[in-house]
Amino acid sequence: MAMNCEGEYGHLIMQDLILPATHSAPEVMASYARFGRRIHWVDGNNMPGAFQMNTCWWYKPNREQILSNPKSQVGKPHHHSYPEILGFYGSDPENPYDLGGEVELFINGESHILTKSSMVFLPPDVPHCPLYVNRVDRPIFHFSVVMNNLYTFDGERKFTAE
């Protein structure tokens, strides 16, 4: 896997988007592009030894798109056998705590409305989602970090960069 920097530690620096096969399918990328843009996806496949993290910008609401797609991974509750942290950040440098929109996240069936920049810790096996972007006034930066080398649901389905 080619990385972007040279030198002894250049292989530890990712500057391009390298998605797992399941996320790089044209229909998946087109669907995501309707409301946001992925920036990076790091995992044990494209950076051996790394835990999984992905980043993106959200530009438009996604609620209707999620509700109309029964295959959406964030449209239904799921859990992981490892902890996860979700981050949601507004893009106004003068007011960094203003999310610049509204995100709704369900944790074990309980709805949480986020309008401030937030980090959410999800312990192992805690059901979470749906995750809806209800309103976007300014771009919202989102990330997900899981303490596992691959992103899996319910301990079953693995997303790998084949």
Predicted features and spans:
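A short, N-terminal "cap"/entry segment at the start of jelly-roll beta-barrel domains
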Residues: 1-71
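Double-stranded beta-helix
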Residues: 2-16, 20-21, 131-162
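Ordered hydrophobic segments in well-structured contexts
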Residues: 52-58, 84-89, 119-121, 141-144
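Non-catalytic surface loops within mature trypsin-like serine protease
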Residues: 59-61, 91, 147-149
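Short acidic (Asp/Glu) patches
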Residues: 67-73, 107-108, 124-128
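A short beta-loop-beta micro-motif enriched in histidine and acidic residues
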Residues: 69-85, 93-100
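A short beta-strand-loop-beta hairpin characteristic of the jelly-roll/cupin
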Residues: 88-115, 153-157
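Conserved metal-binding segment of the jelly-roll/cupin
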Residues: 110-134
